[in-house]
Amino acid sequence: MSNSMISDMKDKKVLIVGMGKSGKAAAQAMVKLGADVCVQDSKKEEEVDPQLRVFLKDRNIKCYWNDQPKDMSVFDMLILSPG
């Protein structure tokens, strides 16, 4: 990722779709870059690994479990995670 892309992530609203290993890694990276991160996964909240839920909660990351945002136009970037 170029330096300009990195600096451009500050305060951008990012939705990460899929919270497997690569989704968690993407969330970590986007938080470090200063993005406003939201995540979405088809699992119900109780099916999600408790450690992952703590990780997301501690970083004030909005989660859409078994749901999706009503208005996708609010996001500056979507990251599709394969798993």
Where are these regions (language model features)?
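N-terminal leader/targeting and accessory segments in enzymes
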Residues: 1-83
